[in-house]
Amino acid sequence: MKTVILLLVLALTVAIIIPTINGESVATAISDSEAEPLAESFAEPLALLSKDQALKHVWGVLKKLGKAAMEYVIQQICAKYNKK
């Protein structure tokens, strides 16, 4: 479990410290097919939710964004070292 947490922290650190890899922004890691559902999920009127529900909703969206960014960073690192 500690290893998984360390790997996640490392991936997030790389995504934050190195905003681009091979000239491509990490922000572009989220494809259009992933971005559209995320945008729709934010369209839900958060004002009608309780504070706890709104926080859970926003946290869920942030987790999806973080996962996509981490997957992209890992793919780029693997691609870089598999080119040999």
Curated annotation (Swiss-Prot):
Tissue: Expressed by the venom gland.
Localisation per UniProt entry: Secreted
Signal sequence range: 1-23
Keyword Secreted included in the entry's annotation: yes
UniProt keyword list: Antimicrobial, Disulfide bond, Secreted, Signal
UniProt propeptide residues: 24-47
GO cellular component: extracellular region
Family to which the UniProt record says this protein belongs: Belongs to the formicidae venom precursor-01 superfamily.
Subunit structure: Homodimer; disulfide-linked.
Job description of the protein: Causes cytolysis of mouse DRG neurons, proved by a drop in calcium concentration in all cells and a corresponding increase in fluorescence of the extracellular medium after toxin addition. May be one of the major contributors to the pain associated with envenomation. May have antimicrobial properties, like most ant linear peptides.
Name of the protein in question: U-myrmeciitoxin(01)-Mg2a
Annotated source species: Myrmecia gulosa
